[in-house]
Amino acid sequence: MITNLCFGVTIFTFAIRATYFGLVWLVVAGAIVGLVTYWSLMLCVIASSKNEEDDYSELTEKILGKKVRIFINIIIIIYSYAVMMMFMALTYSLFGRFVHATNFIEKYPDYEDFDDEVWQKAYIKFPVYVGITLGLCFMCLIRDINKLDFSSYIGVGAVVYSLIVVLVQCHDYYKDSKDKYYIKEDKSTHINWIDLGKAFSKDLEFFKGVAALFTANAIHTGIFPVFVGFKYQKDGLKKMKKATIFGVLMVTSLYILSMIISFLTNPFQPEDVIIYRKSKGGKDIAMTIAKLFVSLSIIFTYPGTYFPLRLSIANSFTNGIISTKFNIILTFVSCFVCSAVASVYDKILNYLSYIGGFLTVFMCYLIPALLYIYTSGKPITYWKNKSNFVLQFCCVLLAL
């Protein structure tokens, strides 16, 4: 389940980042962020185990006080709603591209051009969003996230299949993009392997790229419900650590593979999202299936974002008690509100990505360091405490 908390469309956006970072430096950055993510998760595991708390906000109150808990609950609620809206909009966008690619609608005589305006029509938006939302509502009513373990296989399978499709088609798309964009005398059209200078432009691409990497690994609040499944098992702490190592290693490896494969497909002028690329004439059945699989992986990632939201709201208003009535009302209201906002304000993704990135760094990197420091029983001047705080604080500065 840990791996599925990370996967979404983000994994297919790294090619555009590589044009600024240089592929080599982006891969190095991806590996470093993966290592830091693993370390911050281990801080959460240690604090959770020592204090026998498997809820992020309750653990925060126990160690850092009620005011910090209120702050964390607010962050989790805002962050979760922002991510859920993004998932809604992305699922709808992918569904539209899937339908377009299958040519179900006769308005698409040209397979290469996706007419986004058609998908902004109310008579198409309304039934599709309602259908997606109802499906997500019934999934989110589940109380135990570990019952969705199978979704990890769907998420990993969707990513692996999509990367294989991109890899197999890489040669043809590379040749086509080189013919279109490469000019020998113009260095700006050359492949950027290791030039990090482009990232430090007025558009702050370096910080955008680093923030995207940190946000892609923001699974800290969603991982606590996963820990519940290990709590009463023999050697539960050891199993939690193994699951964390495996999950982060799997995610980081797939992220790095995605960077390399998607970048080499079109290193001259890549798409913002590699699976959105234009088909090279006629139907691309393999990529059409990939879009469907990625849509499913996003749908199954949705409950992993909703569960910590439900816990935070319950902790704030019902002392952590989640009755059946409360569960049903909150689930349907939350899902339909996110759906309504995502459908009406279709350009909201850009704003939500900034909100999510800003909140993520505090919630997932700074707070875990503080939890560990106060749990250790040693002063903040102790070398381990100082090193953990400095490391996580540097992550906050970079990701901001």
Where are these regions (language model features)?
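Short, hydrophobic transmembrane alpha-helix segments
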Residues: 13-23, 145-146
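Hydrophobic alpha-helical transmembrane segments
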Residues: 17, 138-142, 340-346
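Loop-to-helix transition at the N-terminal end of transmembrane alpha-helices
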Residues: 21-35, 156, 242, 355-359
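Juxtamembrane transmembrane-helix boundary signature
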Residues: 31-64, 79
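Intramembrane alpha-helical segments
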Residues: 135-147, 153
